[in-house]
Swiss-Prot record:
It catalyses: Endonucleolytic cleavage to 5'-phosphomonoester. Endonuclease that specifically degrades the RNA of RNA-DNA hybrids. GO terms for cellular component: cytoplasm; ribonuclease H2 complex. The gene is rnhB. This is Ribonuclease HII. InterPro entries: RNase_HII, RNase_HII/HIII, RNase_HII/HIII_dom, RNaseH-like_sf, RNaseH_sf. The lineage of its organism: Bacteria, Pseudomonadati, Pseudomonadota, Gammaproteobacteria, Alteromonadales. Pfam families: RNase_HII. PANTHER family: RIBONUCLEASE H2 SUBUNIT A (PTHR10954), RIBONUCLEASE HII (PTHR10954:SF18). HAMAP family: RNase_HII_B (MF_00052_B). SUPFAM superfamilies: Ribonuclease H-like (SSF53098). Belongs to the RNase HII family. The keyword Nuclease applies. Manganese or magnesium. Binds 1 divalent metal ion per monomer in the absence of substrate. May bind a second metal ion after substrate binding.
Length: 204
């Protein structure tokens, strides 16, 4: 049976100059921060090849990450920690991280496109865009910044805790990851409200 393809209407850009895109990476992992990015692109300095970060190779991601940092007008990152995720839940922690990414920009955008189906509370108008990382260039750029940032942090965590395979699975739940936490337990960076982690901690 073929997969039903949904055609989304074209995204209409508002009549503003400073338009930002925001996306998140890391809602599903068992460990580490949820990381968000906010990007304002330069219309006079276009970047080709922007796409949903999940569909790009590691090499292409790294190249685009550098190009976005070089060519975009403004780039900022936000995050919410495992402690905040456990206290707020992953949805509210993600909204908080998105707010922080916008707040961390060195200039206030006039309008913000948010990936997904809801907007965080912001001081400027915003619009949520389903599948925005494939439909809005600013969101695509933000998804690349967020993903490369988080992936590199997981590679650093892998050096600290080499038995968990963080560099490979980036903290997401995999068979190898489950086996590692069953054998070695959890580190302080784990999200203790997530069911597989609760199970290891004997909280279920």
């Amino acid at each position: 049976m073929s997969k039903l393809k949904i055609d989304f209407p074209a995204v209409v850009y508002p009549d503003f100059t400073l338009i930002a895109g925001v996306d998140e990476v890391g809602r599903g992992p068992l460990v580490g921060d949820v990381v968000t990015a906010c990007v304002i692109l330069d219309a006079n300095n276009p970047i080709s090849g922007l796409a949903d970060s999940k569909k790009l190779s590691e090499k292409k991601l790294a190249l685009l990450f550098d190009e976005i940092q070089e060519k975009a007008l403004f780039v900022a990152v936000g995050r919410a920690s495992p402690v905040e995720i456990d206290a707020l839940n992953i949805l509210h922690a993600t909204m908080l991280a998105m707010q922080r990414a916008v707040d961390n920009l060195s200039i206030s955008p006039e309008f913000v496109f948010i990936d997904g189906n809801r907007c965080p509370q912001l001081s400027m108008p915003c619009e949520s865009v389903v599948k925005g990382d494939a439909r809005v260039a600013e969101i695509s750029a933000a998804s690349i910044i967020a993903k490369v940032t988080r992936d590199r942090e997981m590679c650093e965590l892998d050096k600290q805790y080499p038995h968990y395979g963080f560099a490979k699975h980036k903290g997401y739940p995999t068979k190898a990851h489950f086996a590692a936490i069953e054998k070695h337990g959890v580190t302080p960076e784990y999200r203790k409200s997530f069911k597989p982690v609760k199970k290891v901690l004997g909280l279920l």
